[in-house]
Amino acid sequence: TRKYTGEPYINHPVEVMQIVNTVTDDPEVLAAAILHDVVEDTPATIMNVRIGFTPRVAELVSDLTDVSKPEDGNRAVRKELDRQHSAQASPEAQTIKLADLISNSKSIVEHDPKFAKVYMREKSALLEVLVQGHPTLHKQALDIVSSYYNNRP
């Protein structure tokens, strides 16, 4: 289940795919959108993705998978490593990352305002490097982050 909402976990990957589908109908990009968290959140490995899907889908999922490990340092250090990884990602992977940010931000701001302060600061920094992602989704994500900062008490 999803943290905060108790919804079935699959709802988040489906929502990310639906957001991506507003800007592309490329089946490999949509498959990668569904799979974007599979390596981080399940026992699946990138090798499993390579075996079960096309090389392009596997490459996109690899681009979307955080590279940091707990031993790399504190959260700020780890998120910076992941941000640098995202900066090198393909435009398609960055588009999926933007959709993920859009999907997650709504839930976190609503259900965990204390953590949202940290999370939205991280996402603001991430948006600075997701410049190759689809401009429509980049604007939506930027609007969410801006709205958060403009509406804080």
What is each residue range found by the language model?
Residues T1-P153:
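Active-site helical microenvironments for divalent-metal-assisted chemistry
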